[in-house]
């Protein structure tokens, strides 16, 4: 199972990498724009934060296949081993096919249906990123879509994997894992929600109070 953080906040990546067993960091144009840093400045800093073994993801901006391929090559030259995110449009599928031939690893992003995700996988994307909460927000069932996509990949594109994205709650992320997803990416607020459990803090405080009442200190 691979756990990623969905952010371009280098300081938060450094902080949470000490706590979470993260496999890397995913970004998108909106996330990079929010950082107020050039993508060519922030990507090396993110790679440094996750270490050489961590996997970094960045997205192209072009709308046509030729431009996507050119941008993917620029990203790969800047950060060797980066996974290039390609929106799963008609042009995006053509770009994914070409990049597969050239040995550049891709992720099919902006996936709103299982059929769309399957096409990305068949085109050669190693990862496929369904947008769970965004599907829910449009009146669909994000978790069910992930379940369908997971089944399709297992049967017809076993070399690809679901990297579920777009979460608002830890429950959504857990449901994706229960559906068989091998990878998820968490925005910072959802990652923090997993850590901030009031009941846990209350239990620890009770342990400390009982110990202090018995022994007068909090030392072993």
Curated annotation (Swiss-Prot):
Question: Which species is this UniProt entry from?
Answer: Salmonella arizonae (strain ATCC BAA-731 / CDC346-86 / RSK2980)
Q: Which family does it belong to?
A: Belongs to the transaldolase family. Type 3A subfamily.
Q: Which NCBIfam families match?
A: fsa_talC_mipB, PRK12653.1
Q: Determine the domain of life of the protein's source.
A: Bacteria
Provide the protein's localization: Cytoplasm
Q: Which residues form a coiled coil?
A: none
Gene Ontology molecular function: any one: fructose 6-phosphate aldolase activity
Instruction: List keywords of the entry alphabetically.
Output: Carbohydrate metabolism, Cytoplasm, Lyase, Schiff base
Q: Any keyword Nucleus?
A: no
Listed EC numbers: 4.1.2.-
Q: What is its main location?
A: cytoplasm
Protein name, as recorded:
Fructose-6-phosphate aldolase
Q: What does this protein do?
A: Catalyzes the reversible formation of fructose 6-phosphate from dihydroxyacetone and D-glyceraldehyde 3-phosphate via an aldolization reaction.
BP terms from Gene Ontology: fructose metabolic process
What does UniProt list as catalytic?
Answer: 85
Q: Report the catalytic activity.
A: beta-D-fructose 6-phosphate = dihydroxyacetone + D-glyceraldehyde 3-phosphate
Subunit field text: Homodecamer.
Per the record, its GO cellular-component terms are: cytoplasm
Fetch the HAMAP family from UniProt.
F6P_aldolase (MF_00496)
């Amino acid at each position: 199972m691979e756990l990623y953080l969905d952010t371009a906040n280098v300081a938060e990546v450094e902080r949470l990498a000490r706590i979470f067993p993260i496999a890397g960091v995913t970004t998108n144009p909106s996330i990079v724009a929010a950082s107020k840093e050039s993508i060519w400045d922030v990507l090396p800093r993110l790679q440094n934060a996750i270490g050489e073994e961590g996997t970094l993801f960045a997205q192209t901006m072009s709308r046509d296949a030729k431009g996507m391929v050119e941008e993917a090559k620029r990203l790969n030259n800047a950060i060797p081993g980066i996974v290039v995110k390609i929106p799963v449009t008609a042009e995006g599928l053509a770009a994914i096919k070409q990049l597969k031939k050239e040995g550049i690893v891709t992720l099919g992003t902006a996936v709103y249906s299982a059929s769309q995700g399957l096409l990305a996988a068949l085109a050669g994307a190693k990862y496929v990123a369904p947008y769970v909460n965004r599907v829910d927000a449009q009146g669909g069932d994000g978790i069910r879509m992930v379940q369908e996509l997971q089944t399709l990949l297992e049967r017809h594109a076993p070399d690809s994997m679901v990297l579920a994205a777009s979460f608002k709650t830890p429950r959504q992320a857990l449901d994706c894992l229960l559906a068989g997803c091998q990878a998820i990416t968490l925005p910072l607020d959802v990652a923090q929600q997993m850590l901030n459990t009031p009941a846990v803090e209350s239990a620890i405080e009770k342990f400390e109070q009982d110990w202090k009442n018995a022994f007068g200190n909090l030392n072993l």
